[in-house]
Design a protein with these regions (language model features):
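N-terminal Rossmann NAD(P)H-binding glycine-rich loop of SDR-like oxidoreductase domains
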Residues: 10, 18
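C-terminal helical subdomain
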Residues: 164, 168, 180-221
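Active-site helix of classical SDR
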Residues: 106, 142
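Residue(s) in the substrate-gating loop at a strand-loop-helix junction
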Residues: 126
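Substrate-binding pocket helix/loop in short-chain dehydrogenase/reductase
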Residues: 82-83, 90-93
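Conserved glycine-rich Rossmann-like NAD(P)H-binding loop of the short-chain dehydrogenase/reductase
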Residues: 26-40
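Conserved NAD(P)H cofactor-binding loop of Rossmann-fold oxidoreductase domains
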Residues: 74-80
């Protein structure tokens, strides 16, 4: 029987993924780690809930999850704002939670990822990590750091002869999540959660939801003239 760990799983897409995994017969335990508590109206017999602040210095907390074969990192935050309106504390916190914490978690489980046994690892990144926008300057920078980090580690894994990969999930705006102080609505995130799990278990390295419908054109415009696309996003 399998165990999963969802970091940031108390709300939003993380909770939707945790619920999907818990409904499957092959998973016996789904660990949820979040700074916040799981909502009282959400419960599942397979859930094991733990509270942890990703800005903490000591990550030995995660040594207890030695039996997992699935790691999904969905923790992160951000909101629309120009750089001039961001505080220095906000800059430090968003880089720590969105980027540094993910790298530390991957480091903790790297021996499991870089092995011949199946290990499924995914990270919620963002389409903001692929392009510039004045309203996502630091948020986008934190996600761009993850994009390059994941791509680099995946090449390292490939060259070492391992089949496991880290999945970069880079959506645009997701309805039903807590981004920009939104509220969790599991009815709106269920479909995306299923798609993410499918790509995770296929050991894909990149999943951009609505790529053909929306983001293929946007990314091409950005590639053609990133300055013009930045001005377009500002307007």
């Amino acid at each position: 029987m399998r165990e999963a760990l969802v970091v940031g799983g108390a709300s939003g897409i993380g909770l939707a993924i945790a619920l999907q995994l818990a409904e499957r017969a092959d998973y016996c335990i789904v660990h949820i780690v979040d700074r916040a508590q799981l909502p009282e109206d959400i419960c599942h017999e397979k859930f094991r809930c733990h509270q942890f602040d990703l800005t903490s210095e000591d990550y030995a907390f995660f040594d207890r999850f030695g039996n997992i074969d699935t790691l999904m990192i969905t923790a992160g935050f951000g909101h629309l704002a120009l750089f001039k309106d961001l505080t220095e504390d906000y800059i430090v916190n968003i880089m720590n939670v969105n980027a540094t914490a993910v790298m530390r978690l991957v480091s903790r489980f790297y021996d499991r990822i870089a092995s011949s046994g199946d290990f499924y690892c995914g990270v919620m990144v963002s389409i903001a990590g692929f392009m510039s926008s004045p309203f996502f300057s630091v948020y986008g920078a934190s996600k761009a750091a993850l994009k390059i980090f994941i791509e680099s580690v995946n090449v390292e894994l490939e060259k070492a002869g391992f089949s496991n990969r880290i999945l970069n999930v880079s959506p645009g705006s997701i309805k039903g999540t807590g981004f920009s102080q939104g509220k969790t609505d599991l009815a709106l995130t269920e479909g995306l959660a299923k798609d993410i799990i499918q790509h995770l278990e296929s050991k894909d390295d990149l999943f951009i939801p609505q790529y053909e419908e929306v983001f293929k054109t946007v990314l091409q415009r950005y590639h053609d003239d990133f300055r013009a696309e930045g001005r377009h996003s500002y307007d």
